[in-house]
């Protein structure tokens, strides 16, 4: 375990260091179209340095296509990087099968587990993971601390040069309070994981059921069951996601229309486009993330507020008005 400033640094270190250390074997990397930008932008950087990257597709639920991964593997493939669970739609990936594919062909397997670590079981030996990125703030540790797990037989060099901290692999004064915090948070997450999964899954399923049954022209994004226990992501037709967020915020409800890292962007989510949604529907997305501390009463409050907000926004939508007129004539 090597401590970092967070998930983005861990992803950058894992991918760039493998690229540098194994370039004699090859310069080909495989990842997916729905990765976090910490992975996608790192791969784009490496492409500018002469590396080749294959971006494999996903199905309608956001599950990576294993056959595409296997077809993409070449003699010069050095790394497969697939996230453990998607940060926007919550879909959990078949890591064990991907790990088996990678090792069958002698390829290193990295997973960005930032969204999953502390929320679902992740055993690096059982899943065949060689490199794993995590970030503390995703499981109640302080912000600004994360880690990169590196399997002992993986030879990668330093990402930050200078002193001999972290066994000479990451220079710089260690963030001791952050390290203590992430250690305590990891311990708590492991101790309470089974109970938290049960509580979050129950609330999540209740939220999804109410939204889909009570709000017309809504859809759930991501896998219906193989998803993070605290994730619910919806699309509502004829509505802009940003408008929903503003009105929810006025009710004291925190939500997002994509990933937190792209909340300032007006472009539709690359994840929703990758699962096949058209631009106009992807623009009406809403992500609600639950914790073990949420209550059924808070879910009820949120759903009631959301129903009123959607009615209000659709009344102002020319697209919805046109849709109703067209259906009147059918």
Feature map (PLM): residue ranges:
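Pyridoxal 5′-phosphate
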Residues: 1-330
């Amino acid at each position: 375990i090597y401590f970092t400033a967070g998930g983005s640094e861990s992803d950058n270190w894992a991918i760039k260091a493998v690229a540098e250390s194994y370039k004699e074997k090859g310069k080909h990397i495989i990842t997916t179209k729905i990765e976090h930008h910490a992975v996608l932008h790192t791969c784009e950087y490496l492409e500018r340095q002469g590396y080749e990257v294959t971006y494999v597709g996903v199905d309608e639920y956001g599950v990576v296509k294993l056959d595409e991964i296997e077809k993409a593997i070449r003699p010069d493939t050095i790394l497969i990087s697939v996230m453990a669970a998607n940060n926007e739609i919550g879909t959990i990936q078949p890591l064990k099968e991907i790990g088996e594919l990678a090792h069958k062909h002698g390829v290193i397997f990295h997973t960005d587990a930032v969204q999953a670590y502390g929320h679902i079981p992740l055993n690096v030996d059982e899943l065949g993971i060689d490199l794993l990125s995590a970030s503390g703030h995703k499981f109640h540790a302080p912000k600004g601390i994360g880690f990169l797990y590196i399997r002992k037989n993986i030879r990668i060099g330093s990402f930050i040069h200078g002193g001999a901290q972290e066994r000479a692999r990451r220079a710089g004064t260690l963030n001791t309070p952050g390290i203590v915090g992430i250690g305590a948070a990891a311990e708590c997450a492991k101790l309470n994981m089974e109970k938290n999964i049960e509580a979050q899954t129950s609330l999540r399923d209740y939220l999804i059921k109410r939204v889909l049954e009570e709000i017309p022209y809504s859809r759930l994004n991501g896998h219906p069951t193989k998803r993070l226990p605290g994730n619910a992501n919806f699309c509502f037709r004829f509505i802009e996601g940003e408008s929903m967020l503003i009105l929810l915020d006025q009710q004291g409800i925190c939500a997002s229309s994509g990933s937190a890292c792209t909340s300032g962007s007006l472009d539709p989510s690359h994840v929703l486009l990758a699962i096949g949604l058209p631009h106009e529907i992807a623009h009406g997305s809403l992500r609600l993330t639950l914790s073990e501390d949420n209550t059924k009463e808070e879910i009820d409050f949120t759903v009631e507020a959301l129903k009123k907000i959607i009615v209000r926004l659709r009344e102002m939508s020319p697209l919805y008005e046109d849709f109703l007129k067209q259906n009147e004539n059918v």
